[in-house]
């Protein structure tokens, strides 16, 4: 009898018995499923250039190496890149005081040059301190005509439910818009120079 009581108390402690009805209901402590909220954000920018012209900048390993020169002055307090700018390269970015996020690191995970898309994963930084467990940007260049395309950018992130209300106002499409506009500017300037 004593052993059964110890066993029931132990099972109640690790959560394998519903205490109210004493019904076995699995092993939640051992097989815990944490629910996370998945959020998708979208940005699109139409560009008066061919998809191949835009992808030649967006998909280039040179892009990561020259990022501070392409973006508005003062956007980074510190910028370092590990790698050659291609798959596996890591961008370590620190922003000026007073900005949030103040710091994060991104990794170029995948480039598909045939279909003109890439995956860029945020691997650590301030958002992860606020309950974000996954953060991935997908950038696609989609042809809409022989001399026009759309840069379609998506941010997908997962956040613990208790942090969702805090994080939602902090993550937006502004970084995607800034990057797309910088890419379009370079492409259109190059196109203009070549037509002179």
Swiss-Prot record:
Activity regulation field: Not inhibited by O-phenanthroline or EDTA.
- Gene3D superfamilies documented for this protein: 3.30.530.20
- Which enzyme class? hydrolase
Q: Which residues are involved in binding (4-hydroxyphenyl)acetaldehyde?
A: 137
Superkingdom of the organism of origin = Eukaryota
Keywords carried by this UniProt record: Alkaloid metabolism, Hydrolase, Signal
Q: Which GO terms describe its biological process?
A: abscisic acid-activated signaling pathway; alkaloid metabolic process; defense response
EC number(s) per entry: 3.5.99.14
Where is dopamine bound in this sequence? 104-106
- Signal sequence extent: 1-19
Catalyzed chemical reaction(s): (4-hydroxyphenyl)acetaldehyde + dopamine = (S)-norcoclaurine + H2O
Q: Which cellular component appears as one GO term in the record? A: cytoplasm
Cite the active-site annotation: 118 (proton donor)
Q: Which GO terms describe its molecular function?
A: (S)-norcoclaurine synthase activity; abscisic acid binding; protein phosphatase inhibitor activity; signaling receptor activity
Primary role: Involved in the biosynthesis of the common precursor of all benzylisoquinoline alkaloids such as morphine, sanguinarine, codeine or berberine. Condenses dopamine and pyruvic acid or 4-hydroxyphenylpyruvate.
Member of which family? Belongs to the BetVI family.
What PANTHER family does the record tag this protein with?
A: BET V I_MAJOR LATEX PROTEIN DOMAIN-CONTAINING PROTEIN, OS08G0374000 PROTEIN-RELATED
Name of protein: S-norcoclaurine synthase 2
Q: Which organism is it from?
A: Coptis japonica
Starting at the broadest rank, the lineage of the source organism is: Eukaryota, Viridiplantae, Streptophyta, Embryophyta, Tracheophyta
């Amino acid at each position: 009898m004593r052993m059964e009581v110890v066993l029931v108390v132990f099972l109640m402690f690790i959560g394998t018995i519903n205490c109210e009805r004493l019904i076995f209901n699995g092993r939640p402590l051992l097989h815990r499923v944490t629910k996370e909220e998945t959020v998708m954000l979208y940005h699109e920018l139409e560009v008066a250039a061919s998809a191949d012209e835009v992808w030649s900048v967006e998909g280039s390993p040179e892009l990561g190496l020259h990022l501070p020169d392409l973006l508005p002055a003062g956007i980074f307090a510190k910028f370092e890149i590990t790698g050659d700018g291609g798959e596996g390269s890591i961008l370590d970015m620190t922003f000026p005081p007073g900005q949030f996020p103040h710091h994060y690191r991104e990794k170029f995970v995948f480039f598909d040059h045939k279909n003109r898309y890439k995956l860029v994963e945020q691997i650590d930084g301030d958002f992860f301190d606020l309950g974000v467990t996954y953060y991935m940007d997908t950038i696609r260049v989609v042809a809409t005509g022989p001399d026009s395309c759309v840069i379609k950018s998506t941010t997908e992130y997962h956040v613990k439910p208790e942090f969702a209300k805090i994080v939602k106002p902090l993550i937006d499409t502004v970084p995607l818009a800034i990057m797309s506009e910088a890419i379009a500017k370079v492409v259109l300037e190059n196109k203009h120079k070549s037509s002179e």
